[in-house]
A protein has these predicted regions:
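Hydrophobic core of alpha-helical transmembrane segments in multi-pass integral membrane proteins
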Residues: 27-30, 51-60, 102-107, 150-161, ...
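N-terminal membrane-targeting/anchoring modules of bacterial envelope and secretion proteins
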Residues: 1-119
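Generic multipass alpha-helical transmembrane bundles of integral membrane proteins
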Residues: 63-182, 191-195
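C-terminal transmembrane-bundle signature of multipass membrane proteins
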Residues: 157-167, 176-251
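Membrane interfacial helix motifs at helix-loop boundaries and amphipathic/re-entrant anchors
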Residues: 29-49, 108-149, 201-226
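Hydrophobic alpha-helical membrane-embedded or membrane-associated segments
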Residues: 16-24, 48-56, 153, 186-190, ...
Length: 251
């Protein structure tokens, strides 16, 4: 007698393949964007990072759409309402929200302090005065770079929130909702963490190119470098959560 694969297993494999496909497509698109000719290297890398994050989100959302909720034979009403926060990672979700807040704050500060670069292109550098000489240093996360970052984060956040609400209120077991919610949270976190890491790299590069940052520069360094390590940890967790197999068919 031939062994048959349960439909739940096939759907779980389709979900995992969609996630891997999203990451693979993101790598291909990011590579093509990274090697294109441009006089703005920072925007080139920003476009590549943004494309990778959005493709990862798209792959996870596609995988979720390929796994329809099971049709329950008996529906029973629950007195406790289903909430999104009951299914997302209890520790990583607050951390990712904190990183999102840090990203927004850094972009606001960057936009407020940005100035034209050496080629008179607006909002791409920060003016530094050192030993009586004033010069622009960049790239700096001014409005020129903040606009695509905020647009991509807003788009990814809206899509992931919609998916999380849909998962929380549709039929199915708690384990399935848990698995889907974790994967979508990780995809959103990958988008946010990668953008934050790029912004921190911009600020760190500017600080490394001047010796006149003073106390403010030292305080900034004490903030962004630990935040960078924390962001790297979040990025690794998000990647691992996206690619690891789900337990959809194990209930």
């Amino acid at each position: 007698m031939l062994d048959t694969v349960p439909p739940e297993r096939l759907l779980a494999r389709a979900d995992l393949c969609a996630r891997w496909a999203g990451l693979a497509l993101g790598v291909v698109v990011a590579q093509r964007l990274a090697v294109r000719d441009s006089d703005d290297v920072a925007m080139t890398f920003l476009s590549a990072v943004t494309a990778f994050g959005l493709c990862a989100v798209g792959g996870v959302l596609l995988g979720d759409s390929l796994t329809p909720a099971p049709v329950e034979a008996v529906r029973t009403a629950s007195l406790a309402p289903r909430r999104v926060r009951d299914h997302v990672p209890p520790r990583m979700a607050p951390l990712l929200l904190f990183q999102t807040a840090c990203l927004v704050v850094l972009l606001m500060i960057g936009a407020a302090t940005a100035s034209p670069d050496s080629m008179s292109r607006a909002s791409r550098a920060v003016t530094v005065t050192c030993r009586g000489a004033t010069r622009p240093l960049g790239p700096w996360p001014g409005i020129h770079y903040a606009t695509p970052i905020l647009a991509s984060v807003a788009l990814g956040t809206a899509a992931c929130v919609w998916a999380l609400r849909r998962i929380a209120h549709r039929p199915g077991g708690n384990q399935q909702r848990h698995d889907r919610s974790w994967a979508i949270t990780a995809a959103w976190g990958l988008l946010v963490s990668s953008q934050l890491l790029l912004v921190l790299a911009m600020i760190g590069r500017v600080l490394s190119r001047t010796t006149c940052a003073g106390m403010l520069g030292n305080v900034t360094a004490l903030v962004i470098y630990p935040l960078g390590l924390l962001t790297l940890f979040s990025l690794g967790w998000c990647l691992f959560t996206i690619v690891m197999p789900r337990a959809v068919g194990d209930e």
